[in-house]
């Protein structure tokens, strides 16, 4: 679950981290009043969406008058912001952040993720702040410096100093950087985060460090014990199909293709998408119905997949281990009949009672194609999309 920038900065403030004074606003009038609270300009106004690239898309602007603040708010509130990280529809802008402008001397980067290879929280710092860190990692990886947190000791001040020295910081900036490092690490661990990022972390012309931006991603599996974070969830920023899937404990991720995929098991789902791509197709989604693929869940999965107008064919790939394939077949038949599926459905069943399940599909009289294997299934769905 992602948080907005203003929410991230609210957390920073609770942990004593330096950030510009700012207010999240939902109306042009609130935006003007926020500027008055902050004091003399210039100010920075930012669209609050769960996506990067806001500046290049016009969603961040430095303004010198309250009239400009009102104009920015009137232009963006209620609209959708399209960036390189969104789809063509963009993300809805329901709030803008008004904050004091900062005199920037230098931009740095500081962030942390859970590194699955080392099984630790790893902090990354770079002198290349203000740009996509993925681009820096690809083009100049030597400019990214890392430290891993020991799960027994947690963050240590010497690790912050080590990163500060590698960034070329001196004097009081080393102390300030170490404090920010320790604060971010504490937030990460106490709040069960999956990602934390300050890009940019700036050195002001007055010689101080300021968290100019903030990006936080919480671990959705831990929200049951992070109630205040759960209340910060903004469902307007989420794909409605993904939100609907979550209510049925279905793991759904929307993609850009036209072949709907319904699979039991995350690994098999990824493998299914790979083989569809290998045969020239484009998956429209990742959807894992899990081990309990009941008729109700399969029906809901069909509804979610078919709510995407781009879907031209549906591939159902089920491996019957714990679950019996004949019961899955009953669920598929019932779901197709109930939902009224008007696109071809290709089903591959393998494992427990697979032959009986395939026979039930063949005898159903519905527009369901029983594939003989995974390769055959991929070829069938690609052919269906191409009208063959």
Swiss-Prot record:
Pathway: Carbohydrate metabolism; tricarboxylic acid cycle; succinate from succinyl-CoA (ligase route): step 1/1
Binding-site residues for ATP, renumbered to this chain: 46, 53-55, 99, 102, 107
Binding sites annotated in the UniProt record for substrate: 264, 321-323
Cofactor note: Binds 1 Mg(2+) ion per subunit.
Keyword line: ATP-binding, Ligase, Magnesium, Metal-binding, Nucleotide-binding, Tricarboxylic acid cycle
Family annotation (SUPFAM superfamilies): Glutathione synthetase ATP-binding domain-like (SSF56059), Succinyl-CoA synthetase domains (SSF52210)
EC identifiers of the protein: 6.2.1.5
Entry-linked PROSITE patterns: ATP_GRASP, SUCCINYL_COA_LIG_3
Annotated positions binding Mg(2+): 199, 213
Cellular component terms per the entry's GO annotation: cytosol; succinate-CoA ligase complex
Family classification: Belongs to the succinate/malate CoA ligase beta subunit family.
Self-association and partners: Heterotetramer of two alpha and two beta subunits.
Protein name: Succinate--CoA ligase [ADP-forming] subunit beta
Encoding gene, per UniProt annotation: sucC
């Amino acid at each position: 679950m992602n948080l907005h920038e203003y929410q991230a900065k609210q957390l920073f403030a609770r942990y004593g981290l330096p950030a510009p004074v700012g207010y999240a606003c939902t109306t042009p009038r609130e935006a003007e009043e926020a500027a008055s609270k902050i004091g003399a300009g210039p100010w920075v106004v930012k669209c609050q969406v769960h996506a990067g690239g806001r500046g290049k898309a016009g969603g961040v602007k430095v303004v010198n008058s309250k009239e400009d603040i009102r104009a920015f708010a009137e232009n963006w509130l209620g609209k959708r912001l399209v960036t390189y990280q969104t789809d063509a529809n963009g993300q809805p802008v329901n709030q803008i952040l008004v904050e004091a402008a900062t005199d920037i001397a230098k931009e740095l980067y500081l962030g942390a993720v859970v590194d699955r290879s080392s099984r630790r929280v790893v902090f990354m710092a770079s002198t290349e702040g203000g740009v996509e860190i993925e681009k820096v990692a690809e083009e100049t990886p030597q400019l990214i410096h890392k430290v891993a947190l020991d799960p027994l000791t947690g963050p240590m001040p010497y690790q912050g100093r080590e990163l500060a020295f590698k960034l070329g910081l001196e004097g009081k900036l080393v102390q300030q950087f170490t404090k920010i490092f320790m604060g971010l690490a504490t937030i990460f661990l106490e709040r069960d985060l999956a990602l934390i990022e300050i890009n940019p972390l700036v050195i002001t012309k007055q010689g101080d460090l300021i968290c100019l931006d903030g990006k936080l991603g919480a671990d959705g599996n831990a929200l049951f014990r992070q109630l205040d974070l759960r209340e910060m969830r903004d469902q307007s920023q989420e794909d409605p199909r993904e939100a609907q899937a979550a209510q049925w404990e279905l793991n759904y991720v929307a993609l850009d293709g036209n072949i709907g995929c319904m699979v039991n098991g995350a690994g098999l789902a990824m493998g299914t998408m790979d083989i569809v791509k290998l045969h020239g197709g484009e998956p429209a989604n990742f959807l894992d119905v899990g081990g309990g693929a009941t008729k109700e869940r399969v029906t809901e999965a069909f509804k979610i997949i078919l709510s995407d107008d781009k879907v031209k064919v549906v591939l159902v790939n089920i491996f019957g281990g714990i679950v019996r394939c004949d019961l899955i077949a009953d669920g598929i038949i019932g779901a197709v009949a109930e939902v009224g599926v008007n696109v071809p459905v290709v089903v591959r069943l393998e494992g427990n009672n697979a032959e009986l399940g395939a026979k039930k599909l063949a005898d159903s009289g519905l527009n369901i194609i029983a594939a003989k294997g995974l390769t055959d299934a991929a070829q069938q769905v690609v052919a269906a999309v191409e009208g063959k």
